[in-house]
Each structure stands twice: as C-alpha cells, then as structure tokens.
C-alpha cells in the first residue's frame, strides 16, 4: 500500500474551466513540490485547457 510520504504519488488533474477530473498521473514530489499545471485536452470542453492538480 502506498504511504502518504510516497516520493511519486498518484495525482488527479482537473480542468480549470469545467472542473472535470480527466487525467490521473504521477509526479515526483521532490522535483515539483508545488501543484502541477499542464495544458491537456479536455473531452468535456472539446479543446486544450489548463489542467491543475487536485487534492
């Protein structure tokens, strides 16, 4: 089972516009301590939008 101090935890990315949680990925907590933000395709909006890490 993954611990809460895992170096590469699973994170969920949610669309900034429609707030749908579209992607699940992993990130390295040591290299990226802040919230991750990527431009990804949102199927709900039908265009590329900023997706931000949710907690």
Curated annotation (Swiss-Prot):
Gene Ontology cellular component annotations, sorted alphabetically: cytoplasm; ribonucleoprotein complex; ribosome
GO molecular function, one term: structural constituent of ribosome
One Pfam family it belongs to: Ribosomal_L33
Keyword Chaperone: no
Keywords: Ribonucleoprotein, Ribosomal protein
Record has Membrane as a keyword: no
A biological process from GO: translation
Highest rank taxon of the organism: Bacteria
Annotated InterPro entries: Ribosomal_bL33, Ribosomal_bL33_CS, Ribosomal_bL33_sf, Ribosomal_zn-bd
Signal peptide span: none
Matching SUPFAM superfamilies: Zn-binding ribosomal proteins (SSF57829)
Family as reported in the entry's similarity comment: Belongs to the bacterial ribosomal protein bL33 family.
Protein name as it appears in the record: Large ribosomal subunit protein bL33B
Originating organism: Mycobacterium marinum (strain ATCC BAA-535 / M)
């Amino acid at each position: 089972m993954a611990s809460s101090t895992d170096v590469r935890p699973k994170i969920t990315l949610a669309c900034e516009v429609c707030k749908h949680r579209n992607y699940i990925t992993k990130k390295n907590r040591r290299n990226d301590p802040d919230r991750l933000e990527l431009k990804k395709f949102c199927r709900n909006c039908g265009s590329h939008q900023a997706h931000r890490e949710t907690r």
